[in-house]
Amino acid sequence: TVVEAFEERYEKEQITQPRQIDGKFGQNDLKESVLKKVDLSKKLDRETYEKKLDELQKKLTLLHSEIYAKRIPVVLAFEGWDAGGKGGAIKRLTRALDPRGYTVNPTSSPNDIERAHHYLWRFWTKMPKDGHIAIFDRTWYGRVMVERIEGFCTTQEWQRAFKEMNQMEQQLVNHGAIVIKFWMHIDKEEQERRFKERQENPDKQWKITDEDWRNREKWELYEQAVDEMMVRTSTVNAPWVIVEGNDKLYARIKVLETVVDALEKRLDHNE
């Protein structure tokens, strides 16, 4: 009966309680950590940074016009550690873009309307029109990070999310979109330094919350979750780009270079 069907579904989809470290979290086929192999010593001096920044932003301005003319949509997804430099990188990108041709979509906890839909719905509705750029400051990958670790979704939900997100991105690519996903990576010591700097600067105190400090206590869990996420969702058509972010100047230039290179390659291919 209909009632029995509902009861059976309810039993299968019980929301789990926030999970604890039990020795099983993050057990997967990874032989070594993706993040721990990243060289965070990479740096850029201010003079080189300013020169590259000017060159890349001028290129990006022209490329933005070209992708608009050719109706190519672009999705730029930013994830990373708290205080990892997402906002700074996005700011240097958008300064080169025509305001009429892009949107920046900050992602926070879903509201009541969003919770009433499939978790990807709120992201699908913000995907770019042809020829436009959509930038996401945090993304659908929260499903396999914060929602997984804090118990905001069931085990079945986050496990199947890898395939669902790959499929969504492939659909965008099939439509002609360029999809690039950035992980802004810093080490735990650099994060602590930036947190303290924010606390001590009245102009930046709004950027730091008690939740940010609590999340640091689960650094190792997040690291395991990110490693698995990278391996299972970095594809040829929608790759993850790990940005070495301990040096902000280096990180901003790497993001710009990655976007410029991707747009140039697509436009060359289309000619």
Where is each model-derived feature located?
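Glycine-rich phosphate-binding loop of ATP-dependent small-molecule kinases
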Residues: 1-271
